[in-house]
Regions:
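Non-catalytic, well-ordered alpha-helical scaffold segments
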Residues: 16-20, 37-46, 357, 386, ...
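Inter-lobe coupling/hinge segments of SF2-like helicase ATPases
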Residues: 60-61, 87, 100-419, 481
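Upstream accessory/linker segments immediately N-terminal to the RecA-like ATPase cores of bacterial MutS
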Residues: 1-76, 445
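Generic amphipathic alpha-helical segments used as scaffolds and interaction surfaces in large
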Residues: 8-16, 30-39, 79, 136, ...
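Short acidic (Asp/Glu) and glycine-rich catalytic loops that position anionic groups and cofactors
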Residues: 2-4, 22-27, 68-72, 126-129, ...
Length: 509
């Protein structure tokens, strides 16, 4: 079989040929050089596929969208944008003024003001007489965006609408007609906004919220949806270490919101032994008596024989015995409408405590919830703990996060909880998480819906990504169409590692 690895790289690392590597790994799964060679191949296929997606997007002519500023100037903001917001808005405005479609990833910690940046981008599209779409991963988040943007746009000549899988009948028809006629400027919704039957008059910008629910394949599908590829802005509240950006977003430019709006009180985090559970519950009672709300997070849905973790159902029973009908429960096995109904009651203040598994991780906004208790915090990864903590601290005043830990912690768990106590900076936490857990595990848990690496060991993945990225760039520079002998071999690597959608792009191009 022809070789797709650059010969000097293969020789330098002492790697066997592909067939020999396969034979050796079958004979001895612990064969380090054979495994490293195959792991590199998988990462190389990932990097090459992303570069091809980027090249394809860059080669397509989109349309330049230049706003005249009339809508942005009319927006009455109660505060000035942060320096990071202003810088990012300039980057986006510059991208959208180009004929190549924007492909930009916006990373911003919880509360850093991504929504305002997204709104400004959507207003540029509206000023240029194009439509914008905002895609959210869940119905709750879509409705939250719709309500927030509706308030911010009050009094402006901008028409917004919402479309989710649950909208039926005349309401849905009216929305579809408004989108098709161009009467609606901004459409907000779940994946329903890109299903068949939804036709845009002139889609110029797509904003995707909470990127880790939305993989490379979906990004490619979006690019294919419009006759002229729209500009694409992708937002994530989970900071991504630079190495992992190459693996999951290698085709995108990156902006960072790395400062918080003034006046935000940092969340105070305390690590407490689960032996003191009764004292924590007593503290929760005082918190509720003060008219505040709280989240209580449990890691698993049901007790399993293998696990001594406290189930959410059992904790809800304990808290209900103490606080009565102020306690609600949401978990991953509930149906969407059922979950939404409980969340809506919590948001409306009818419930004081929301007991949850990690389904509250993404984006829910209840400013009166100023306490979060996370049970068995030592069983969660850093990025997930940070995301969960970000559910509080969304209003004025001080918020608190209590991390309940087991006894007999490992060194890694101790380091994790100590870091959570000492910093609220998501970018610091993301880099440290990479050191503590390794890239493979981090990618696997974060990028749901995105291909996980199967062969690379967590501690070797970061260096493999850097090396494979350089090699894939070299090949793409020399042989964009993958027509040479090495290019043909690289096509085979894309097929073998299930990245053949990228080969389809080559054929189409």
């Amino acid at each position: 079989m022809p070789e797709w690895i650059e010969p000097s790289l293969k020789a330098r690392n002492g790697w066997p040929d592909w067939r020999e590597a396969l034979a050796r790994i079958h004979a001895d799964p612990a064969d380090a050089k054979a495994r490293e060679r195959l792991a590199y191949d998988e990462v190389f296929a990932n990097q090459l596929a992303l570069l091809l997606v980027r090249g394809e997007a860059r080669s397509k002519r989109g349309r330049a969208l230049q706003g005249d500023g009339r809508l942005r100037d009319a927006l009455k903001l109660p505060y000035s944008p942060t320096g990071a917001q202003a810088r990012t808005m300039r980057e986006i405005e510059g991208d959208m003024a180009q004929i190549q479609p924007m492909l930009r990833l916006l990373q911003g910690d919880v509360g850093s003001g991504k929504t305002l940046v997204a709104l400004m981008a959507l207003l540029i599209a509206a000023e240029a007489d194009a439509q914008g779409a905002l895609l959210a991963p869940t119905e709750i988040l879509a409705r939250q965006h719709f309500d927030n943007l509706g308030r911010m746009l009050a009094g402006l000549d901008v028409r917004i609408a919402i479309l989710t899988g649950r909208d039926k009948g005349k309401v849905r028809e009216a929305t579809l007609m408004g989108v098709a006629s161009g009467e609606i400027d901004i459409l907000i919704g779940t994946h329903a906004i890109f299903q068949e039957g939804v036709t845009y008059k002139d889609l110029g910008l797509v904003v995707v919220d909470e990127q880790h629910r939305f993989g490379v394949a979906e990004r490619m599908m979006l690019q294919a949806k419009a006759a002229v590829p729209p500009h694409l802005l992708v937002m994530t509240a989970t900071p991504i270490p630079r190495t992992l950006q190459l693996a999951s977003h290698g085709e995108m430019d990156v902006s960072k919101l790395d400062e918080m709006p003034p006046g935000r009180e940092p969340i105070q985090t305390t690590v407490i032994s689960e032996d003191k559970l009764d004292a924590v519950i007593a503290g929760l009672g005082r918190h509720l008596d003060a008219g505040k709300q709280a989240y209580w997070v449990c890691p698993l849905v049901e007790e399993s024989e293998k696990s001594d973790l406290q189930a959410a159902e059992a904790r809800a029973v304990t808290l209900t015995a103490r606080f009565g009908d102020k306690v609600g429960l949401v978990h991953g096995r509930m149906k969407g409408p059922e979950k939404d109904a409980v969340m809506a009651r919590f948001a409306a203040g009818e419930l004081g405590v929301l007991v949850a598994t990690t389904v509250i991780e993404v984006g829910v906004d209840v400013p009166n919830a100023t306490l979060i208790v996370i049970e068995h915090a030592d069983r969660f990864g850093l990025a997930q703990l940070h995301q969960l903590r970000g559910r509080v601290g969304r209003g004025g005043g001080q918020s608190h996060c209590i991390l309940l830990r087991g006894n007999g912690l490992s060194e890694t768990s101790r380091a994790r909880l100590g870091l959570m106590r000492d910093t609220t900076d998501g970018f610091v936490i993301a880099e440290r998480d990479l050191e503590l857990r390794g890239a493979g595990e981090l990618l696997g848990t974060r990028q749901s819906g995105e291909q996980t690496f199967r062969l690379a060991t967590p501690d070797s993945l970061a260096s493999l990504i850097v090396s494979a990225n350089a090699d894939a760039r070299l090949l793409e520079d020399q042989d964009r169409a993958l027509k040479t002998e090495r290019g043909q071999a690289a096509r085979m690597a894309l097929y073998l590692f299930e990245r053949d959608a990228a080969v389809g792009l080559l054929r189409a191009g």
